[in-house]
């Protein structure tokens, strides 16, 4: 069962255009496909009213969150804030935040479409919400394998192909910057941190 999906768009960059030569992203369809594929492959049982929230923002906004929750005063591509409830009981699985400038820059540098890269970031963020991590080398390898299979189901090439999937320190990496780890939820929600962008809800199935 795909959870209910809440999407909020804080930065107009997400709705104006993709990278050069690309059409604007269809965020609703992209997110629903990515999370649906992740749920199917992970084989998880979710609460009937499970919900996940996504915020599409700019680098300045995610930099503030990264500094507040992880002590890193820099923008990043994606942050995840899992619920502290047990997965099978959680009505709110958590939040995924993705920044436009960093994500678009990575996609361009890696010669991949913005849609493919953002799909990867959504999958990566959602896997954090359901318990995957990459703090240790073994965890990173397991998470990367799951990402590769899910993205293949979506018709997206292996994002780690030609790179060192696991760095010596155990971080899962892509060119330019590692996909970011999750933060602690600390009982916050996107409703508390969102400055008033566009939002919409997709029905689960």
UniProtKB/Swiss-Prot annotation:
Details of cofactor binding: Binds 1 zinc ion.
Membrane-crossing residue ranges in chain numbering: none
Binding locations of Zn(2+): 124, 128, 134
Keyword terms of this UniProt record: Cytoplasm, Endonuclease, Hydrolase, Metal-binding, Nuclease, Ribosome biogenesis, rRNA processing, Zinc
Any GO BP annotation: rRNA processing
PANTHER family (alphabetical): ENDORIBONUCLEASE YBEY, CHLOROPLASTIC
The protein's name in its UniProt record: Endoribonuclease YbeY
């Amino acid at each position: 069962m795909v959870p209910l999906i809440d999407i909020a768009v804080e930065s107009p960059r997400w709705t104006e255009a993709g990278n050069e030569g690309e059409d604007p992203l269809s965020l609703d369809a992209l997110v629903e496909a990515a999370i649906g594929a992740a749920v199917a492959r992970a084989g998880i049982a979710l609460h009937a009213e499970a919900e996940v929230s996504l915020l599409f923002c700019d680098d300045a906004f995610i930099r503030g969150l990264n500094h507040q929750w992880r002590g890193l005063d820099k923008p990043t591509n994606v942050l995840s804030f899992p619920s502290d409830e047990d997965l099978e009981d959680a009505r709110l699985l958590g939040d995924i935040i993705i920044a436009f400038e960093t994500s678009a820059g990575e996609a361009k540098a890696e010669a991949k479409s913005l849609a493919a890269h953002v799909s990867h970031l959504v999958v990566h963020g959602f896997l954090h919400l359901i318990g995957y991590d990459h703090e240790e080398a073994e965890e990173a390898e397991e998470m990367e394998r799951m990402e590769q299979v899910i993205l293949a189901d979506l018709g997206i090439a292996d994002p780690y192909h030609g790179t060192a999937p696991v760095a010596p320190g155990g971080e899962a990496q892509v060119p330019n910057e590692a996909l970011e780890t999750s933060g602690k939820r600390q009982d916050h929600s996107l409703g508390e941190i969102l400055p008033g962008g566009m939002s919409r809800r997709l029905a689960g199935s």
